[in-house]
From Swiss-Prot:
This protein's domain notes: The cysteine framework is XI (C-C-CC-CC-C-C).
Propeptide intervals in chain numbering: 62-74
SS bonds (residue pairs): C28-C42, C35-C47, C41-C51, C46-C55
Keywords: Amidation, Cleavage on pair of basic residues, Disulfide bond, Ion channel impairing toxin, Neurotoxin, Secreted, Signal, Toxin
Source organism of the structure: Conus ferrugineus (Cone snail)
Entry protein name: Conotoxin fe11.1
Tissue specificity: Expressed by the venom duct.
Length: 74
């Protein structure tokens, strides 16, 4: 009889632990949501306090066009 109680208790403990693991693993933020760390995002990228697939540097494109215009005139 003691064996059954122990087995049932262990079985229930395993179920509870699996449930807790499933709940904590689903705790991520979708794209464009506010974030502070990469681990908070489902896509594992936090760029400028927002979950984003690619980090963009503001002004980089404008700077590149300026160089192309400068070299194109020569």
């Amino acid at each position: 009889m003691m064996f059954r109680v122990t087995s049932v208790g262990c079985f229930l403990l395993v179920i509870v632990l699996l449930h807790v693991a499933a709940v904590t693993s689903d705790d991520c933020r979708p794209e464009a949501a506010y974030c502070e760390y990469n681990e908070q995002c489902c896509i594992d990228k936090c760029c400028q306090a927002s979950c984003s697939d690619a980090c963009r540097t503001p002004g980089k494109r404008v700077h590149g066009h300026g160089l192309l215009r400068f070299f194109g005139q020569r």
